[in-house]
Amino acid sequence: MAERLELYKCNVCGNIVEIIHGGEGTLVCCSLPMEKLKEHNNDEEMKEKHAPVVVMDGDNKIIRVGTIEHPMQKEHYIIFIEAISEDKKYLKRKYLCPEEAPEMDIQKCDYNKFIARELCNLHGLWTNNSIKKTD
């Protein structure tokens, strides 16, 4: 059963879909079942460039991708960064383009504990499940 906010990808055409309302059945694209994107969060080899982290920049709180800045070229970039409230009722997402800084301002998020996720076009979905927004 597909659940809210899960991401699925077609391995033929590259379409990516997000579940808005979970249900039974199999998601199909190009006549084949779609693959659920696995959430990476502990792959030490790539974690430094992919795991979302919250940092302070003066008075601003931002989510950055990795402790070492992620490349942002046409061939390899972050598609989006998002913050999801712990109860999964609220979501803030920023879509990125190549050459744009891989970060998102979360100053105006009203939820204190949230999940941060980002999607890399080459290395998939990365998650940090236990972020607390400090005032």
What kind of region is each of these model predictions?
Residues 119-129:
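Short acidic/polar inter-strand loop motif in beta-rich domains
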Residues 63-65, 101-109:
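Exposed aromatic-hydrophobic patches
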Residues 1-12, 21:
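Intrinsically disordered, low-complexity linker/tail regions enriched in polar/charged residues
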